[in-house]
Amino acid sequence: MKHIILVITLIISSINLYSQTTEDKDKSVFNGYDGGMMLHTGYVKANIKPLNYIAEGASNGIGGAIRFHFGQHYRIGTEGYVSTLNLMNNGSYMKTFWAGLINDFYWKIGKLMPYAGITIGGGALTDCFIFDGDNHDWEKESNVIINKKPFVAIDPIIGCDYCISESIHITVKFDYLFGFNNKDLYLPTGPRAYIGFIFFH
């Protein structure tokens, strides 16, 4: 954990230093903002040790981001997502919510705008496991486990926009969410792919 925090600190420091250098060179500090919504899906997996159960499958969800542009390559803002892994075909699920501060670099290459960065924040994992019955009736279920855990979220990202125009982009990105808690956190992990529209101002 200490090594991860050190790496993140170095990344953010490098971003800030590069941003300041770029701003001085281009004589422009604030260069607008962008924001939009994205859908995502990805294959995730978690070993739920207290239940001796391995949860895996497609986790789908939605979310969005807003970022402010400084210099010619640096953005800082906030983003948040919710992602649900449905299990057992009976209403069981693992729902992950996370949000935080996003820092990234971007470059414009013709109609393309690749970017890479990291989001640091927090989230919550809500689990519902139905081992007897399902959610398709009004019967009381006798064997249901519900658990909710907060966590520190660290989410590296890489992606690319296709610039339809100066103000409208289609974005595709990939991430891998890491969660940290003092104990008993069984966060489904794996790569996620996102697609959405981003509007620039």
Label every PLM stretch briefly.
Residues 68-140, 152-154, 162-168, 198-201:
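Gram-negative (and chloroplast) outer-membrane scaffold detector with strong preference
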Residues 31-33, 56-62, 93-99, 112, ...:
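Residues that define the transmembrane beta-barrel architecture of outer-membrane proteins
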Residues 26, 47-55, 88-92, 143-148, ...:
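Outer-membrane beta-barrel domain signature
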Residues 34-42, 79-81, 115-121, 173-175:
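Transmembrane beta-strands of outer-membrane beta-barrel proteins
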Residues 40-50, 81-90, 123-127, 177-183:
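Sequence/structural signature of outer-membrane beta-barrel proteins
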Residues 154-201:
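Predominantly the C-terminal beta-signal and adjacent terminal strand-loop region
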Residues 1-30:
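Cleavable N-terminal export/targeting peptides
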Residues 19-70, 74-76, 200:
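Short glycine/proline- and aromatic-enriched beta-strand/turn motifs that initiate or cap beta-hairpins
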